[in-house]
Amino acid sequence: SEMRGFLEGMPAGMRESIAGYDEAQIVVVLALVYFLAPMYLILPLMVASVIAADSFAGEKERKTLEALLYTPTSDRDLLVAKMLSSMVPAVAIAWIGFLLYSVTANVAAWGTMGRVFFPNLMWVFLALWVAPAVAGLGLGITVLVSSRAETFQEAYQLGGVVVLPILLLVVGQATGVLYFSSWLVLALGLFFWIVDA
């Protein structure tokens, strides 16, 4: 069958993770655990980008940045505070989203799975290691774009390009070119942290 051909193309580690499941359970695990994993990364990326675009370009557009620059706060402290005000909510929302998705996935699939099956180790790495790195990537690119943008909308639209690598991960996972595993997720997180630095 088509499912058997798809499963044969998967890495051995991924095949082992679904061994012992019937076909309906395999579909649930593939859909909820593997195929949606890269899409989860869009959440911290976009939250950080929107908040950063408003914080940097939006302040410039509203002409409120000048007042901040006249305060006794150093430029460095102001930059760090603005970056943290984008990064912290993005990571918090990603972690809350992870918890809500964990509950929802287990409740929705209980009839098929009959047990708690989510999250697996790969998702824990994705939420705790990769999501903050992706938020940092969105933040960094938006800060760079905001320095040249005149308006919040312009900064947000130009910074939206940062979602393209994540969309490539989504397409790669859906087409079978790329399979998320714990090791790939750890490597992906390391790559994003290096880019952030």
Please name every model-derived segment.
Residues 181-197:
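Alpha-helical transmembrane segments of multi-pass membrane transporters/translocases
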Residues 48-67:
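Transmembrane helix boundary and interhelical loop/hinge segments in multi-pass membrane proteins
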Residues 31-53:
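Long, hydrophobic alpha-helical segments
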Residues 1-35:
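Hydrophobic alpha-helical transmembrane segments
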Residues 55, 114-163:
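A structural motif at transmembrane helix-loop-helix junctions in multipass membrane proteins
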Residues 67-75:
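Short helix-to-coil transition segments within interhelical loops
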